[in-house]
């Protein structure tokens, strides 16, 4: 396409079209009266949908004109041409797509953040008098897609709506394809952005009084009408404030769900949540036209019912995608996803992004997992049955919206047939999640029987092709089919009969769409054609004829087939409407199937990866024996991952892992031990499947688990992996999963915070250090003593003394004021001094083995603080030139000889705070009198 400069030079007209006297690139610039009738109608429709790309049906193509033609040609890499639109206007830009390729091109446009208005022909062009009647039959936006080919099977496609009022906000979101519909309200403005980041909506509605109320902001586009608290990476549609009126929104919800009050769905006292939900419903009415969107009854949720994971934590823990390249492979979801249904895949993603806070609910999931782990043959049989169930949620959604085809309904019928088999399979189970499958709604059994008795086993893809309905379903349909068979039989016998009558052995009866049925005779025999033959076409080697009786039979076949297709479609519509009436019931069953699928998959992972069932409780303790990173261990050869234990936040010391056993030992005792290359690193899952939690045996006496661990060690030794490992184990446990450890006892966390790595934020002009400080400030302002905080390299993006000072004060604040369970990885070895000041701080290190000419990373976490980072060795391993490595060693020797960084602490008053500690020796606040903190 042409560069932007070319567009500007020609008033928006690409250079190639400017050469062809195209004067108007925007339909707003033309006088409608000067256009041809069809183009006048196009402009009228475009004015009604200025925010959307208008696809206008003309024959076998969907055409676009003016600015939309330029946009579509550019985005889809199509040929941009022009069309004559009248003497005054002349030619205008045009691009088109074949009608049969509509879905394929719409997918590309929707993925780029465009809305599309489909203006289709609503009458037969052959019967039209004058201009063919056209109407907008559908508006496709990123958040309202229901077509199967435009959706990812294993993730939701959410449409969201946000209403702000002061510091409070309301949020509603729905998946049009599955019918899910939720709303909430909160008073923390920072949380609205975090909730949108969790949902990753394809489109978000926002009320504004902006002049262009129908503007759609594509991802990254700026607008003065969009508040700072809303993330810019999403697609936003600006709507009128009136669309979110509380009175109208409330009335719309009551009418849609046939309610007398909103009290029963929990949002009667949440006006902003009601406004957001009502505004979302109005948008669906505007975009879906006559297509009904069967949403489930609105459900109200509360953010405080779930473990809070902010965007930074989801990114750093790589829950659904990797932080490096944003891919699925290598994420926690990838490592745990053994689901066999699309519904289960979507449910697992939701579970991982919304871990539970209720111990009882977590234990319900664990109980189900335990049954599935203990009985491998039962789990295998269950998964085999689940594999045969199609995507009930989206099939019900398409049926309810009137877009399901014959294959969709057959898939539903086949799925319903598996439900009684599933019910019999889980008849004796006790766990609540599997008990949900024991009851098969009789309405669905009856519906499945109806669908199977009416529809053929393999219906065609398109409803207009016929052959949908079985014989014997409708007497009129059977009669019409018999008539067609009779007439087609007559035509089939015509060829041998005419050969006998005419004596022309090469005579044939053929058919094409242009002429219908005809009789073909070679030109050399054309003089033998009977007088009742009517010549229709002359070709190089043959003459084509018709007869009155042949045309009569042909007309009867065509007319009867039209009647058959019409009647079949009517019967199919009745079946589809019947399915739509049961959409809510189908979705209830789908939710039970999805949950069972998730838990069966988690059980499979637990078996093959050697996971244990964590002992969950409402306390602050985090005790993990032989913990492992769930993703990294799957990426390494079996047994190569070195497990490590963790103890945080408890009142007693338990554990049979390295940390628990090592209390009271010298930190350097094991540093020269041989590295563990994987032998016996974790239980063999084939011989030791996880069952009930392994009791953690008491270790040597220790006053408490620390609230904060200062973790030091070499570069590339595995500190960041260890931090993520602890966070992922806690998250998995609160999802209800078993965890990669030999034993674990875990208290509920209200939030998990991570600050692991940082990069410049060029979009907002923030440096690496400023990004780091913003994330750290967020943690300090929101963490509680029930939070888990994982910090890596705080203060590294600025001068050494500044960074050390900040790291010290942050660690001190977390341990003494907040008392959050914290692991603080750092290369500031001076922070080891904190363990001698605050008695809820402990030092641990990732050990190495020193060899004469190299170091070996052992990846083992042991008590005690490291005094070296071995950064030069890490540089050598990374491939820095030998001369650079040698020079670095020389410089380091000189620095160590002439400089000493020491923290001068002097005795002071007892520090007042919540942490348990010895008397604190504090730095004198008066700079003139304080000791040298960083003396040289």
Q: What residue spans do the PLM features occupy?
A:
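Conserved phosphate-binding elements of NTP-dependent enzyme cores
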Residues: 40, 44, 594, 830
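Charged, surface-exposed helical/loop "interaction arms" that form contiguous linear patches used
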Residues: 401, 405, 415-418, 471-472, ...
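ATPase nucleotide-binding head domains, primarily ABC-like/P-loop NTPase cores
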Residues: 66-67, 270, 340, 351, ...
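Charged catalytic and DNA/RNA-contacting regions of genome-maintenance
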Residues: 2-6, 11-371, 387, 391-400, ...
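Amphipathic heptad-repeat alpha-helical coiled-coil/stalk segments that mediate oligomerization
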Residues: 244-249, 308, 323, 414-489, ...
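Active-site phosphate-binding and catalytic loops of NTP-dependent enzymes
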Residues: 119, 142-151, 291, 429-433, ...
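Extended, charged coiled-coil "arm/hinge" scaffolds of SMC/Rad50-like chromosome-maintenance ATPases
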Residues: 539, 543-576
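Intrinsic disorder/low-complexity segments
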Residues: 2, 7-13, 18-19, 25, ...
